[in-house]
């Protein structure tokens, strides 16, 4: 089955200065709440004081999580679970806006956490397979691996210890599992670009996955941060490899 017979893509000319379209789904209350929130977080002093108060409140076990979820979290996140995101997905879809579910958990250090994150990423791919308003899936490799190990793996002259090599093999297995699921369900998946000093190993894995799963349709996508001075040449080299 061709990717393009299952999913329909349209080229739409957008005018980003047309706020009537951009904020069509938002009520005046939503817009006023967002305005106040952005005014508050634009102040370094307020942010610094607020962070200290938040940590203090958490130590005292005060119920601040509810407040955070109804303010800052609500502004920037669709939900804590896939099901919580469903109303937003439906609302955006009604106006022709697609959603990409991005499970943004990073900084973990235990293998069990990485495996759990992998399973949740796969759940987002399964959701995208059954939801017409989710055209792509995405994942960050820093969510399924130790950052320090990615740093070492990107420095080719550094030899890894046996335990580190084993951990690296587990990372590769997780990436393969995610991309294989995307291929089987015919869901395009982005491998998110990360910090420049760990990007080399991520690019290597992305290329391997593209070679493996993009033989019939385009399933695996690498992403490129074009503000980097070296990325245009990298993009050209990718094009040559693709040809």
Each language-model region and where it sits:
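Short, positively charged and aromatic/hydrophobic N-terminal segments
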Residues: 4, 8-12
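Positively charged, amphipathic and often flexible ligand-engagement surfaces
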Residues: 11-243
